Amino acid sequence: MPEDIPQISAPTIYDHLAVILDQMSSVAWQKLGLQPDMVTGKIEPDLTQARVAIDVVGFLASQLETQLDEEDKKHLHSLVRDLKINYVQKQGGT
């Protein structure tokens, strides 16, 4: 194998979780009615589905936390917090 070709390693479970977390956070924003649906292009809030997506994001964040540096941990915590705050606001809470 030539030395100038970089070796590519297989993704870890944490790499896969990060991708899923990113997808679920997008779904959560869509289901909160804060982003258009990726398929229809319409704003279609569904707070029941938003809650599930937010719970999944929170769980995935807890699994990834040990693999992250402090800056990435803060970003992840902010994401989960922002999703939860927006969920409460959409429900009519304060």
Task: Identify the role of each PLM range.
Residues M1-F59, E71-T94:
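N-terminal intrinsically disordered, cationic/polar leader segments
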Residues A61-L68:
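Well-ordered alpha/beta subsegment
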